[in-house]
Amino acid sequence: MPEKLGVFCVLEQKEKYQILKEIMKEGESPEECMARTVGSEDSAPFSWKARGILTLVREDKPAEYVFLFRAWQPAPEDRKEETDTVCWTKCDEILQNLAGEEEKICFRFLLEKGPFFSLKVTFDRRNILRSATVNGKPLELFDILKEDGSPAGIVRERGVAHLDGSLHPTSHIWIVRKNHSSGWDLLLQKRSLSKDSNPGCYDISSAGHVSAGDTYLPAALRELGEELGIRAEEKDLHLAGMRKAYFEDVFYGKPFRDYEISAVYVYDKPVDEEKLVLQESEVEAVKWMDFQECCRRVEHGGMKHCIYMDELEIVERYLEKRKDREQ
């Protein structure tokens, strides 16, 4: 028998939760361990479903294997018992109280509907998250930031960061060209309908998260290449400013909390939109729009978008300073 086998169960009662964890006894099945653990907390009847398995790897330690369950229990008013001995907690409080990043990832996946999954999470010897995969597919990891923008020493999975609103870095690139009306056009991208937030909305020319271990400028160059097929160099991107912003909404029935510090870049090399190679999973289409017209639509309506005026103002200030320097 491996050194450690365990269960991790999310027990739900009317959108409140309890996290139950237990080590399996010799000769005990995962289902028996889960039932024993839930039963020890509350004798009320419950239903359950096996959802996945976690392989937990830490440097210089034996691997751990944890069976993942989701269970449901009726609220006290829906059953004969007058008392409820389990401490029920809302989703946000659960995330704050979970000690390990692997538990946060498990909780995030167990909240979602889907087939049985295999999750593997690896930590380095400093106990910092190094990698996470689900069914063999890598999950995106972020470096979490302090309020001043410095690293917090925490690496977090993308879905968890967007569930609890952790501050993380992103790179935004605005592609511009000169025109004869307001002075500049902006290239807008229309987000893919498959995006986990703001699907089908017009957005920044190119934008993306800064992966764990990466920095703003390399991330910006990578996003330009991946989303639009533009192979740029560091000298082609001009830093217009930094922006901190928080956005919260519900998409596909799930809360989405995006708290980010963004490096805002301007790219002014010639771009033929007809020759761009769009990443279908990210970008549905692109279009040029006059800068002032874009500002009017963002401020007063007229297009479905997820663009913010304060970021357009950052770009505008940069372009005005550049114009002054060129005169």
Predicted feature residues:
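A generic fold-level signal
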Residues: P2-K4, E12, K61-A63, E81, ...
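Residue-level signal for short segments within beta-strands and strand-turn junctions
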Residues: L11-Q13, Q73, K146, I175-R177, ...
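Nudix hydrolase/Nudix homology domain
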Residues: E81-L139, G200, G241-Y252, F256-Q327
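Acidic, metal-coordinating catalytic segment for phosphate/diphosphate chemistry
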Residues: M1-F8, K137-S181
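Well-ordered beta-strand positions enriched in small/hydrophobic/aromatic, beta-favoring residues
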Residues: C9, F67-F69, V86, I173, ...
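Active-site segment of metal-dependent pyrophosphate-handling enzymes
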Residues: S43-P76, C91, S192-L193, G225-E273, ...
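Conserved Nudix-box catalytic region and its N-terminal flanking loop in Nudix hydrolases
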Residues: Q13-E41, I53-T55, R125-N135, R158-S171, ...
